[in-house]
Amino acid sequence: MDGLTLKRTPDAIKWIQDSLAESNIDYVLKHGTYTTQIQHSMGTIKLMLNNFQNRVFCASQMVKKDCKNSVNGQEIMKATHYKKNYDANPKIESIKYDTCLNIDLSSAYAYCLFNSGLITKKTFNYLLKLPKMERLTSVGMLATSHVKYFYSGGKCVDFQPYREPTAQIFFYLIDEINYLMQDIKWMLGNDFIFYWVDGVFMKPTTPKSKIEKVENLLISLGYKYKYEKVENFSVNRIQDKVIIDMIKNDESKRYEFSTGASGRELGKHIAKKAMQDLQN
C-alpha cells in the first residue's frame, strides 16, 4: 500500500486501518484539515479531501514565508484574535424586501494581508491570479492543524495535536475584516441589516450619502468592493437566532446565526477606536 493517494472518506480510512491491524503493523495516522496520511514501516498512504493544484500550495508557502518574515507578522503571532465574522441589526425582528443593497469586498483576505504589510507585492499579485476558492484555501492554510495518532497492535497508544504557528495571522484577518464590517454597521445605523464575513447588507432605502461614506471608507483603507444582485430578501428572528433568506446572483442562499451577548465585541470596537484617537 506504499505510495497510494486516495479520496479521503471514512470507509477508505477504516479499510486501511483494519488492514494494518490484521497485519499487526504499527503506524502513525496524521489527520489534518485537507489531508490524512498513514505512515507505516513500508511507506506512506495519503488520502486527500480535494485534489488541489500545486499553485495552491505554492501560494500558501509564499504567504507563510512573507508573514513570518514581517515584523507585523511576528507581533500578530504572539497575540490572540477573535473569530466572529457576522452580526445583525438587533432592532430588526422580521422584514421582507423585493431587493436589497449588498456590498462585497473583493479578495478581502488578500487585500488585508497586503494592506497590513504581511505579504509582498509579488505574493499579493500571485494570490489575486488564483480562482476565489483556491485563494481562500491558500490563505486558510495559515491556520492548518493536524493531529498525529500513534497506533500499536491495532490500538491508539498516544496522540499529538499541532497548529501552524501562523494560525493567529489568519484569525487576525478575520478580526480585521470583522472590525471593518463593524465600522460600516455604525456608519449605516438603522439602515444596516446584517453582515456576513466580508459582505454587508443594507436597506434598499439607504440614503446615498451613507453609501458614499461606506465606499469612501473602503477606498481609503485600500479595499476593492463590488455590488451584488440580491432579490427576495427576508429576515426572521427567533429570540437570539437570525434566519436570512435571499436570491443572490440568481442563487438561493440562507444564513443562520446567533446574536447572543456581544459586549466583548462592542468593548473591543470602542477600545480600538479610542486607541486610534489617542495615537492621532
Task: Write out the residue ranges for each language-model feature.
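Conserved acidic
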Residues: 1-280
